[in-house]
Amino acid sequence: QNQPLLDALNACIAACEHCATACLQAGDVKMMARCISLDHDCADICALTARLVARGSEHAQHLLRECAEVCKACADECAQHQDQHCQECAEACRRCEQACRAGLQG
């Protein structure tokens, strides 16, 4: 029953890792510093959340709330950049935010 949530979390991890790597390889790393930082934070909290959800932890609900907030912050930042990897990351983060919020109600 948690598979759609786990899929969204894993897709977000992949998108954030790809975005951070692409930003680091771009010319102006300083301009992308907040994006890179949020990508790392988002990938990390998504990974931890996925592990807790997968094992049915009683603490998963707490992390789902925080994960949704970090996904929103990351999506908002990435959406400001025109790079394709940033736009794709913003979409994945928004989908993950929605999945986490849905998981809170389930």
In which residue ranges do the predicted regions lie?
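Amphipathic alpha-helical hairpins
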Residues: Q1-G106
